[in-house]
Amino acid sequence: MPEEKIPRPTIKRLAIYYRCLEKQLLQEKNSISSKEIGELLGIKASQVRKDLSYFGEFGKRGVGYDTKKLLEGIGEILGIKKEWDTCIVGAGNLGVAIANYPGLTKSGFFVKAVFDNDPKKIGSVLASGIIIDDIQSMPEVIKKRNITIGVITVPASEAQKVADALVDAGILGIVNFAPTKISVPKNVRVEEIDISVVFRSLAFHVNMLQKGEW
């Protein structure tokens, strides 16, 4: 099915299902139902089934899913078996934390470069062993290292300029942590992650719980 017909929330939930199934397989749970997946994740079983139905049949009604086969199937859909070379633009606290996060490598995302425009940071070596490159070298480095995904961790005022540079260098996917929307061509995918929005959403739910309305 064409990607544009699959709801973006479904794609995000697939990643959550994948992580859940990994844990279940480690616990030697060889079969699992949509109800069990839903209970583990706080998602309706009908939603789990609907999400999976976009990609064909994974299990049998009344029997459930083979955990390993479902994990492999979702992994193939998400491209997890592939290795994705990634770069980070902005060597501030957030950018450095992401670059040093070992979970990315385990998920198939390899940070091949970190860029910044601060002369004091350029040439520094991160805990992960990555050397911070001058942002001016970004086009050359991205092409040389076959990087396809870029992560933006710069101030909002610089985000669009960085996005334009990433696109010009051939980047096909961008994770934008800057608190502003960016514009890119239709052939480039963007995931906007505004941490403040997550906190506001959480605050709403906590507020409702405190009021006893939930």
Curated annotation (Swiss-Prot):
One of its GO terms (biological process) is negative regulation of DNA-templated transcription. GO terms for cellular component: cytoplasm. It is found in: Cytoplasm. NAD(+) binds at residues 90-95. Keywords: Cytoplasm, DNA-binding, NAD, Repressor, Transcription, Transcription regulation. Its main location: cytoplasm. Residues 16-55 bind DNA. GO terms for molecular function: DNA binding; DNA-binding transcription factor activity. Pfam families: CoA_binding (PF02629), Put_DNA-bind_N (PF06971). InterPro entries: CoA-bd (IPR003781), NAD(P)-bd_dom_sf (IPR036291), Rex_DNA-bd_C_dom (IPR009718), Tscrpt_rep_Rex (IPR022876), WH-like_DNA-bd_sf (IPR036388), WH_DNA-bd_sf (IPR036390). Belongs to the transcriptional regulatory Rex family. Homodimer. Modulates transcription in response to changes in cellular NADH/NAD(+) redox state. This is Redox-sensing transcriptional repressor Rex. It comes from Kosmotoga olearia (strain ATCC BAA-1733 / DSM 21960 / TBF 19.5.1). The lineage of its organism: Bacteria, Thermotogati, Thermotogota, Thermotogae, Kosmotogales.
